[in-house]
């Protein structure tokens, strides 16, 4: 895997800032990711569960809906469905 010293330095700087879920580094990442992918509609989340909940909400999933999922999935994959009042 690719690694250079500047990555460790930046990681230490981010951790020392106390802003690991928000702040200038998240904004910088979002802007860089959007530019690299040619898409200005980028939303970052702090974890996969919140990303799934946001995607489900934006897809119109809500109370009373059924969402197909795998029975061999971890709890984090199904909890956003239940949080929205839908049935996994």
Please annotate each region the language model reported.
Residues 70, 87-88:
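Short beta-strand->loop structural element characteristic of the AMP-binding/adenylate-forming
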Residues 1-20, 24:
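N-terminal "arm"/small-domain region of PLP-dependent enzymes with the aminotransferase-like
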Residues 19-66, 77-84:
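Phosphate-binding glycine-rich loop
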